[in-house]
Amino acid sequence: MFKRRHALVTAAICAAAFAAVGCGGSKDSSAASSSTGSKKESNNLVVWSFTDELEGMIKNYYTPAHPDVKVEYSMTPTDQFPNKLDPVLQSGNGCPDVFALENAFVRKYIESGLLLPLDDVYAEVKDKMADYPMQIGSYNGHVYGMAWQVAPGALFYRRSLAKKYLGTDDPVEVQKYVKDLDTFIQTAELLKQKSDGICDIVSSSGDMFMPYKGARKDPWVVNDKLVIDPAMEKYMDMAKLMHDNHYDGRVAQWSEGWYAGMKGTLKDEKDNPVEVFCYLLPTWGLHYVLKTNAPETSGDWAMCAGPANYYWGGTWIAAYKGTKNAAAAKEMIKYLATDDTFLEKYAKDSGDTVGNLNVQNKIKDTFSEPYLAGQNHYKDFCEMAKGIDGRLIQGTDQQIEQYFSEEVAAYANGEKTKEQALNDFKTQVATMLD
């Protein structure tokens, strides 16, 4: 779930609520596709993915532990991956045995009826696996996809700004200022007042989409009808309030200005300096967003849970239901997603927050992150993952949230009233669901 988790696909949807966004790239690249054809049962596996992360896991860990298995690996950029996978799954011709599924589109496939059930694998490991990834990977009582990691979201804040304006940089104390969504907005006003208007609580209101989504009680669709959870209406109100009161830096996620806020170099439209108090990011955001783009601020950051439990990103592994190599496919998924020995080594090597609870409990007290001034982020992430509900995720989420972000943008920017924006959103979704 590193490399930057094509969560950036989802991120583009969220950021679209405030500006056109060019999402950051990854190390993905195209590769020629291969076919499983009609092979007899064997240990040969064709694996497709959208990220080089899985390739490294197979090459550096799985293959040495399974020297008798020949793996043919193909990688396709995230935005092209569904278009490559869909036709072969639907036709049954040229399907990979095993493939990765990104959070933005995983439920589409989990609900498709085209995946190999993994119930027997899950039955062996269920007591040691985190709940929410398994909830997302399950449908109608069957498990179809398994994830090796969890990606809970947190709030990362500048210690120096917390000391200056809140009087403390202690994560326990700072959490009190952002403990829920209403308190978060109150603190946005407090920061404005104490800083004489130069400190924005976030650089982009789009950062708040995932926490508000995490606060929902209902999914987007119930009985084939759109449901707008109160948390999503509150998100609309928040976006408008933040825009009107200049509580955010008025830049888009993944934009140059968004990154500038991390470095402390953001300026407003009049070229005045702007301080950015915090960023709401998941596990991979620490290593591949903050540390990568603002190395000069190392030691001036800390982390707390923030206003709501949420997750962001992740990769699930699944198999085609018609694979001729079902036993080998299941063994690969079981190893990569659940194996204690492998995941302990992988977690230590990569820093990834794995979903295996045995491994979490064994290693979580051993971490100290210099970028966070020695704070143990790993232990906190493991705790945050416990409060995430994966049962609200649906295959239609990506398209619905794209429509929603467009209407939130129109409302926040004063182009539509809230009523107009909601009515247009409802019309778009109704057409989609028909």
Q: What do the PLM-derived regions correspond to, one by one?
A:
Residues 2, 8-107, 123, 327-331, ...:
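Conserved N-terminal structural module of periplasmic/extracytoplasmic solute-binding proteins
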Residues 53-54, 370-429, 433:
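C-terminal capping/gating helix-and-loop segments adjacent to ligand/active sites or protein-protein/ligand interfaces
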Residues 80-84, 217-293, 298-300, 327:
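Extracytoplasmic ligand-binding clamshell segments of periplasmic binding protein
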Residues 82-94, 111-112, 162, 185-190, ...:
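Short helices/loops that flank or line small-molecule/ion binding pockets
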Residues 102-154, 163, 182-185, 298-305, ...:
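Hinge/lid segment of periplasmic solute-binding proteins
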Residues 115, 287, 310-311, 315-398:
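Mature extracytoplasmic/periplasmic domains
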Residues 119, 123-124, 137-207, 219-253, ...:
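Helix-loop-helix "hinge/cap" segment bordering the ligand-binding cleft or interdomain interface
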